[in-house]
């Protein structure tokens, strides 16, 4: 399962790397003349209810794969050749209108073998858009469009604004994957329409959006509305997206899901990211760059109002975590570290990668936010997944309705009055200058915000760290002001049991003299080395 997942995600991620950049060809093939896309067949009445009925009908019928064997020249494209194929600006959907938004399409080839049908919706009527080889510039691919089937189809699409036709702000490409950016303009983590059996003992399933319906916006609209029809061996679904382009881009999503079979682990609103090396985990720290990650932590706002921060890791083995909840208020994968000096990468700009925050629109009931961390040696492999898993397994014949909002930007749209964690550092424990008699592991956790800046200026104030561990023992526990960050640093050592290399779950927060919390809750999982590898130097 992991090899299949690794191959699948690595191929998709590699393609995203290219399409996350501005069009290298710029306006080289842009013209003032706009060529309207050819339409297929007759327009038909369309709305979200009709799409849900179609998804329900799909689920009632046997599944069939839409993957096709592509013409040999497309199959043999290298990565560089494929990414040089660009949709022509003069063929962009809505380029012949005064709408604020435009759509450009991705070509099939390389890793993308499943045609996705594209429809335009105008005044409640949908009509399919025809693939046209002449709508693409084939760059250095060695192709010229001649000889390609007229009904080849598209792989996906991207959204631009009329003011910036070279850089997209959202894109849908590969299975049910999509991405967006905020004002930073830098792609990073992905979202998916649905996750099926991620991190389970069996093979993971990757549902596909098999059709998109793009609703023509009015000239003054700041929101573009689109719909997606999803299908896979175990489930079908209908989606409605309302995408508002802003400094923090917002997607308002409604989904209706229709299982074909019982699903072991259903993932709602999945976020997919990459974490290779960070301040707290340098297991893969042979790269010259200090840190390599799209996001550095999972942020939770639970149904009972608790704020939780869980730093990410690149584990030695697959790691799976469940955070039980009832009607969660939100969760997401965040990139809190925004300092270029911590990454030193002027090519992919990890410090500009967007956070992705999931906000349920109504009560989701009982279930859990689940976090899957997969070992990776390679930053082109997305190894982090977080999603909501309903407590009850879906069964055939059900209709499952989930509404939520996705926010893409430098910060999530919600914040707590409590202080928050800005850094987690780890290393060998002990007292500097004294010979170590046994193995321990040091944790240094920095908190800023809330009341901490004011408290840090008062010398006689008492701030108490509250620390819990599932095994082992804590040593040298302290919480002291750190004026350089206008906050507090908590430090402690963990001494593992001599006869156990089992993971240790750690829970930490700061409280005042009245027992009131001053910070969010910091959670961590540490896997101590086996006894033979516990070097004390």
From Swiss-Prot:
It comes from the Bacteria. One of its GO terms (molecular function) is carbohydrate binding. Keywords: Periplasm, Signal. It holds the Pfam family MdoG. Pathway: Glycan metabolism; osmoregulated periplasmic glucan (OPG) biosynthesis. InterPro entries: Gal_mutarotase_sf_dom (IPR011013), GH-type_carb-bd (IPR014718), Glucan_biosyn_MdoD (IPR023724), Glucan_biosyn_MdoG/MdoD (IPR014438), Glucan_biosyn_MdoG_C (IPR007444), Ig-like_fold (IPR013783), Ig_E-set (IPR014756), TAT_signal (IPR006311). It is found in: Periplasm. GO terms for cellular component: outer membrane-bounded periplasmic space. GO terms for biological process: beta-glucan biosynthetic process. Predicted to be exported by the Tat system. The position of the signal peptide cleavage has not been experimentally proven. Residues 1-30 form the signal peptide. Belongs to the OpgD/OpgG family. Probably involved in the control of the structural glucose backbone of osmoregulated periplasmic glucans (OPGs). This is Glucans biosynthesis protein D. It comes from Xylella fastidiosa (strain M12). The lineage of its organism: Bacteria, Pseudomonadati, Pseudomonadota, Gammaproteobacteria, Lysobacterales. The gene is opgD.
């Amino acid at each position: 399962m992991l090899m299949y997942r690794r191959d699948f995600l690595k191929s998709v991620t590699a393609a995203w790397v290219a399409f996350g950049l501005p069009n290298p060809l710029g306006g080289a093939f842009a013209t003032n003349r706009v060529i309207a896309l050819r339409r297929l067949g007759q327009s038909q009445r369309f709305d979200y209810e009709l799409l849900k009925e179609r998804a329900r009908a799909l689920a009632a019928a046997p599944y069939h794969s839409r993957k096709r064997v592509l013409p040999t020249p497309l199959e043999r494209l290298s990565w560089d050749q494929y990414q040089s194929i660009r949709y022509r600006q003069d063929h962009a959907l809505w380029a012949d209108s005064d709408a604020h938004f435009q759509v450009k399409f991705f070509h099939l080839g390389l890793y993308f073998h499943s045609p996705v049908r594209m429809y335009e919706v105008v005044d409640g009527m949908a009509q399919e858009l025809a693939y046209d080889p002449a709508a693409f510039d084939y760059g250095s691919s060695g192709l010229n469009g001649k000889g390609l089937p007229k009904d080849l189809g598209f792989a996906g699409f991207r959204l631009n604004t009329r003011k910036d036709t070279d850089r997209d702000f959202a894109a849908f490409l590969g299975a049910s994957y999509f991405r967006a950016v905020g004002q930073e303009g830098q792609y990073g983590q992905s979202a998916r329409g649905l996750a099926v059996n991620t991190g389970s003992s069996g093979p993971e399933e990757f549902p596909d959006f098999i059709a998109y319906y793009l609703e023509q916006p009015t000239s003054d609209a700041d929101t573009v509305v689109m719909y997606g029809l999803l299908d896979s061996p175990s489930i079908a679904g209908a989606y409605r997206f309302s995408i508002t382009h802003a400094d923090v881009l917002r997607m308002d999503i409604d989904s209706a899901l229709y299982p074909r079979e019982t699903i072991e682990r259903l993932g709602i609103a999945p976020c997919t990211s990459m974490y290779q090396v960070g301040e707290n985990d340098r297991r893969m720290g042979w790269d010259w760059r200090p840190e390599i990650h799209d996001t550095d932590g999972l942020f939770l706002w639970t149904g009972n109002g608790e704020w939780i921060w869980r730093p990410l890791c690149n584990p030695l083995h697959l790691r799976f975590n469940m955070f039980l909840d009832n009607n969660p208020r939100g969760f997401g994968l965040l990139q809190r570290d925004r300092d270029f000096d911590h990454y030193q990468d002027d090519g992919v700009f990890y410090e500009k990668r967007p956070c992705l925050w999931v906000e349920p629109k109504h009560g989701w009931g009982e279930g859990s936010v689940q976090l899957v961390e997969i070992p990776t040696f390679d930053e082109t492999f997305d190894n982090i997944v977080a999603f909501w898993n309903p407590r009850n397994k879906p069964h055939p014949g059900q209709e499952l309705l989930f509404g939520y909002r996705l926010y893409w930007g430098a910060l999530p749209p919600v914040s707590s009055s409590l202080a928050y964690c800005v850094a987690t550092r780890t290393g060998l424990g002990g007292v500097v200058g004294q010979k170590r008699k046994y193995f321990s592991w040091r944790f240094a956790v920095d908190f800023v915000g809330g009341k901490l800046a004011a408290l840090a200026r008062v010398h006689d104030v008492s701030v108490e760290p509250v620390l819990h561990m599932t095994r082992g023992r804590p040593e040298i526990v302290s919480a002291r002001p750190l004026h350089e960050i206008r906050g507090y640093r908590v430090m402690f050592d963990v001494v593992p049991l001599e006869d156990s290399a089992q993971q240790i779950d750690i829970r930490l927060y700061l409280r005042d003299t009245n027992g009131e919390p001053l910070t969010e809750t910091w959670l961590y999982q540490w896997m101590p080395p086996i006894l033979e590898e516990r070097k004390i130097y």
